[in-house]
Structure formats: C-alpha cells, structure tokens
A protein has these predicted regions:
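C-terminal/domain-edge helix-coil "capping" segments
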Residues: 29-53, 71, 77, 113-119, ...
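N-terminal post-signal-peptidase region of extra-cytosolic proteins
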Residues: 39, 106-114, 126
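Bacterial N-terminal signal peptides
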Residues: 17-27
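Conserved Rossmann-like nucleotide-binding pocket used by diverse enzymes
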Residues: 25, 53, 125
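N-terminal segment of the mature soluble domain
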Residues: 49-56, 61-110, 117
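Bacterial N-terminal signal peptides that target proteins for export
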Residues: 2-16
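Conserved acidic residues
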Residues: 122
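Short, flexible beta-strand-to-coil junctions
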Residues: 59-63, 128-133
C-alpha cells in the first residue's frame, strides 16, 4: 500500500491534499439549525385558533432592526404555511396607535382579551431575538390564546453560516422554524 502511494505524482498528491482540506473546511460552513418546539395539542385543538396577530419581536441587540426583521420573516413564513390567517402588520399598528399602545408591548397595557377584541384575532404571536449575526442567529416565538392566556405552542430556533449574508441566514433560520412547527402540529 505504501509503495502504491509513493508512485503517485507529487502534483497529484498536492491536489488530493488540497481537495481534502477544502472539503473539510467547507463542511463547517453549511447551515446548522437547532429547533426546539413545545405545544399543548389538546389545548390547541380546544382553542381552535384561526387568525393571529404577529407582534414585533423583542431584541436587546444594538441592531434595533433585529426584532422587526425576524418578526416580519416569521409572519411571512407563517402566512405562507397556511396554518393561520394573519392580520396585516399595518392594521395592527393602526389599531394600537389609535389606542395609544406601543406596537411592541413587552407587557401590553391591554389584556390579551382586549387585544383579541380590538384586532379580531384568536391568538397573538410574541417573540424575542437572542442572537443576530450570520454566524449565530437565534429567536423564540410563542402563540398565546387571547381567550385563555395560555401559551399554545413555542418554537426556538438557532442557525448560522460562515459564508452567507445575514439576510440569507435569517430567512433560512425562520423558514426552518416554521417548517418544523408545521410538521409537529399536523
């Protein structure tokens, strides 16, 4: 075996070594997603959520657009999944502005039932962004019933890539979360 290796031309050995190192290096550049979901199937069926409002996600990052960006992607992907009817973001902001309520209430001054009545929804999606860069992007979203106040499902997702723009990482990470949620809730 060693004698066979010695017969390989030096240039081919170098090329094989380079190819091996390249494959090894690039294998760490692929997207890695980790999803954690939890839900209460009996309660979810009992509540029969049809229409939801997705609020701006909270973010403690210097980039103040992180919460807005991820919540909009989550809203879009949730709508495309067909799981729920989604109230238009502009309508949410208009109704809340008319009542003097901030658009991203960490602890809303209105009760969930009041929010449900005002927005004509069965559930509200709240969320937070914990990491926001192309290497590590993480968020959590949860659906809360406006009738019972119970969290009906929760999804936490992380993802990241070395050689991709943040917008692509965010899009892939959110899509993966909604897909996983959709699969588990079937």
């Amino acid at each position: 075996m060693l004698a066979d290796f010695r017969r390989i031309p030096k240039q081919l050995k170098s090329l094989l070594a380079f190819a091996g190192l390249t494959i090894f290096a690039l294998s760490g550049c692929t997207a890695k997603f980790v999803t954690h979901t939890s839900f209460d199937r009996p309660q979810l069926q009992q509540e029969n959520i049809q229409k939801v409002a997705v609020f701006l996600f909270e973010s403690t990052y210097i980039d103040m657009q992180a919460g807005s960006h991820i919540s909009r992607l989550f809203e879009l992907n949730l709508q495309q999944s067909g799981m729920y009817k989604i109230v238009e973001r502009a309508e949410i902001e208009k109704v809340l502005r008319e009542r003097g309520v901030p658009p991203s209430p960490a602890e809303p001054p209105l009760s969930l039932r009041q929010l449900g009545d005002l927005l004509k929804v069965d559930g509200v999606v709240f969320g937070s962004v914990s990491q926001y860069n192309r290497f590590n992007l993480g968020f959590t979203a949860r659906l809360v019933s406006v009738k019972s106040g119970l969290v009906l499902w929760s999804v936490s997702q992380t993802g990241g890539r070395y050689f991709a723009p943040l917008s692509q990482v965010a899009d892939e990470t959110v899509k993966e979360a909604v897909l996983e949620l959709q699969t588990k809730l079937r």
